[in-house]
Structures are given as structure tokens and as C-alpha cells.
Amino acid sequence: MENPPDQTESKETLQQPITRRRTKGGLLTMPFIIANEGFEKVASYGLLQNMILYLMSDYRLGLVKGQTVLFMWVAATNFMPLVGAFLSDSYLGRFLTIVIASLSSLLGMVVLWLTAMLPQVKPSPCVATAGTNCSSATSSQLALLYTAFALISIGSGGIRPCSLAFGADQLDNKENPKNERVLESFFGWYYASSSVAVLIAFTVIVYIQDHLGWKIGFGIPAILMLLAGFLFVFASPLYVKRDVSKSLFTGLAQVVAAAYVKRNLTLPDHHDSRDCYYRLKDSELKAPSDKLRFLNKACAISNRDEDLGSDGLALNQWRLCTTDQVEKLKALVKVIPVWSTGIMMSINVSQNSFQLLQAKSMDRRLSSNSTFQIPAGSFGMFTIIALISWVVLYDRAILPLASKIRGRPVRVNVKIRMGLGLFISFLAMAVSATVEHYRRKTAISQGLANDANSTVSISAMWLVPQYVLHGLAEALTGIGQTEFFYTEFPKSMSSIAASLFGLGMAVANILASVILNAVKNSSKQGNVSWIEDNINKGHYDYYYWVLAILSFVNVIYYVVCSWSYGPTVDQVRNDKVNGMRKEEEEVIKLN
């Protein structure tokens, strides 16, 4: 008997993705995707780490102005992933977005390399002779520099959110009973491999810049970015490329508009509501959830004749939305408080320029008998080493051991991990303040109060604990937040989920700039404040204590947000599994 045309078409549609899943995607694509982001991170982080020194020496910007420029650049770099995620999910698709972004990053790095190669595009060298004033950078010179920063930010905005989601697309398989564990492991190892790239940036690239100069130090990242784009495009035939949906933000705006238009509508009782809400035929949601119930008015059918056409579809999508649209907006609104708690940790991590100046003023030898000095810009490697070590230990030792002891798979709830990371971030700032107090006190006792360029007789290894704590905090909260967003959001919002942590870092850098300037202005006594170009004259220990206090308040804020959020998707699923397991055990006992 011949199938009706619509059933045949449906069967072909179902079979097509299954065939694609067998022939494309999988672990084979991981080296190309991770290599693309890895090389991008080596290039961009390698440029960032020493950039404050480049701005102060070659462009003659003061510490506060130079750091403010870097705060804004990093903020733009971390904000652009939201734009990239929107374009990816709604218009371009993840593959094309990554290709365009790689080209933008490459152009930005070439322009930055040109600022080092061409003397006329930056201030002339400062000659230290009597009566000679050093010229400042002109508007056109700064414009070229900022153009390079902007192109790099645009590139990062397309690569970073899409690479993570694009990689997850290659592995995500709902038919696999271990799908959750595969994705959790993927997120951890993805961050670990990205962190290896950052580690290379903090060591190799920084070393090259310190010893071979800016021309080679900026040229190598450009070459790496070219290699990153080539490798990604080379593997194009192997990728699973999901189709884009309609504009996500348009759909969210329609929910807000429809809910407002029908704000006076009385919602049906819960037990009578199944047929009162508008949904598409292939939707699994028969009715919206009870949380943020006022948004349910957007998908409530008030008058079938006025709201629906003869084909059963909405006549006006700005007045009647689907249940899926409503739940997407709810998912986004619901995570905002939890998302905001990660901002303070990102503010703490963004203080690397001050830590760079601290390291430059200290004894950076590995031991008193050693002649090798760790470059000041390379101390960030201890943060990355701590992050990688935790990922490996957690994934390969802690979880397997706990699962073996309990006799069943064990996972540490993502909300617990995020909270622990925020508390460790508070400890990191408390340690930073204590170490800086000791460093400054030692510098003054050695008569170096007015000489920030001399080395204080104190080992820079005292800075390692705070870097390690920052790494643990980021491993717990950073990876935890990304996993949290990805599992709580619908799959059509994967790139948005991957970009939210970066958006938090963007907001953090803007707030860090505000806090920095506020502390500098409010602490000024005469011509000296807590924030000075000469760190021996300033009081960076007091500044760190301000951040530590804010971090502790943030931990309390997180506890409140976590409690009010309620159970996560994983918690609900695990409760169901545990309930079924208990029922099976009871049946076995009865038999």
C-alpha cells in the first residue's frame, strides 16, 4: 500500500538527519574546531597580556588611561560574542559566522602588526634630552590602533560562541543514553584545550615579545590566525551544519509585545489550559510552564476566529506566539540573576595589568641561584595550569572514584560548583590584598617608594597562590555557568548560551573601569591616590580589599539567586531517575 505524500515526505525528512549524523560530525571534527579557537586564543591573549606595556611605552598612555582602554577593548571583545551568536543562530549559521570572524581577526592582527612595523603610525621615539617634551599619540594614530582592536573584537565575537556550540553540534545525540555525560566531558575538555592555548600565549608569545620585540611579537599571532582559519575551512565537508531558525530576538520581542497587548487577559485554569495555548504541531510543549506566568498571555488563544487562520496558524505573530517562543524568553529571563553573579568574578580576573606591574617589581627568578627570570606577563600561566589541572582531576579522578564508591554515576550539581567558584574568587582577592600589602611595605623599607622600576627583594612566587585561586574559580564558575546555560536553554539558543559568560565578562570590564576610576578619584589625597603609575606610592592593597568585600557580598547574592531559581533541568531529570530506581528496588524487595 502506497504511503500518502505527506507521510512519505515526513519519513524522508526524518531519515535525512539520521544519515547525516552517521556520515558527518563526531570526534573526527574536533581537532579542526578546537584548533581554530585555540590558535585564535593564542593570538588574541598573546597580544593582550603585554599590551599595557605597549600602550605605555610606544603610545605614551598613562597607567589608568591605558588600563581603561584595555578594559574597553576586553569589554568589546566579550560583548561581541552576543552579536555573533545572534547572527549565527538567526541568519548566517555557525560555520559561516566562524569563517567571517576568522577573517576579521586576521585583518585586525595585521593592522596591529603594522603599528609596530611603521614608525609614522605612532608617536616618534622619546629622546631623553633637556628641554625635550615627548609627543603624545595623535587622534589618527589612536584611530588606527583602535581599528585593529575593533577588528580583533569582531573576530573573537564570531569565533568564541560559535566554536563551542558548533563543537557540541558534532557530538550532541539525543539517542545516546550517555549524551549528558558526553557533553559535560566535552565542555570540560574544550575549556582545558582552550586553556592550553592561553597558556602558550602567556608563555611563548609573551617571551617572544619581551626578547624579540613587538614586530615579531605581533607578527606571529597574525600568522597563527591565518593558520586557524585555514584549518577550519579545510575540514568543511566533515561538519554537521544545522539550519538557522528565524530571528531569535524577533521571536522574543514578539512575546513581550503579545504579553503586553493581552495584559488584561485572564489566563485559563491549569487543568483546562491544554487546548487554550497556541503551539505548532511538532512542538513537545502542550502548555507553558507556571513560572513567570504573566508571559503565558502571549501564547493564550483569546478568540480562535480572530487569532487563527483556516490553516490553524497565527494570523498576527505580534499578538499570538507559540508556547516554544514563550519558554525561550522565560529561560533567558530566569537565568539573568544567576548570570549576573559571575560578573564579580570576571572583575577580579580582569586585574591582570596591575598584577603584571607587581610581578615586574619583584624578583622573578625561580630560585636565588637561578639566572632565568619568568617574564612578568607569563605569571598568568599559573591560572591556566590550575584550571587545566582541575578539569583533568575532576573528569578523570574525582568523578570516576565517587561513582565507583557510590555504585552509580555521580555528578556534582552545577549550582554547587558555581557557588564554590565564587567563594574561591573572594579568597583570591583577599590573598592578593595581603601579598600586595607585604610587597609595598618591603619596597618602602628598602627605600624604593619613589622608584617603581627597581626590583624589590621579595620573590614573585608569592603571587602564585592568587593566580592559582583565580584558575580554580574560573574552572568552577566559568565552566559551570557555560554548562548551566547550555542545559537550561533550548538547543536553538545554543550560541546564545555559549556567549552569555563572555557577555558577563564584557559587563565586568566596563564595571571594572568604573570601579577603578571611582577608587582613584575618591581615594585621592593631594596628588596621590590608591591607584598610581608608581605602584609603590599607591595603595593597591586597599583597592584589592574593596574588590574582596564586593566579592563576599556577591557570594551571598549568589546563594539567594540559586535558591530562588529552583531545581535545574539536570536536577529534575536526576530526581526522576532516582525515583524510578527506588521504585525498581521496592519491586525487587517485594518479589
Swiss-Prot record:
Disruption phenotype: Nrt1.11 and nrt1.12 double mutant is defective in high-nitrate-enhanced growth. Pfam families: PTR2 (PF00854). It is a multi-pass membrane protein. It is found in: Cell membrane. It comes from the Eukaryota. Expressed in siliques, shoots and roots. Mainly detected in larger expanded leaves, in the companion cells of major veins. The keyword Transport applies. InterPro entries: MFS_trans_sf, POT_fam. Disulfide bonds: none annotated. One of its GO terms (cellular component) is plasma membrane. The chain crosses the membrane at residues 68-88, 98-118, 139-159, 186-206, 216-236, 329-349, 374-394, 418-438, 460-480, 496-516, 543-563. One of its GO terms (biological process) is nitrate transmembrane transport. Belongs to the major facilitator superfamily. Proton-dependent oligopeptide transporter (POT/PTR) (TC 2.A.17) family. This is Protein NRT1/ PTR FAMILY 1.1. The gene is NPF1.1.
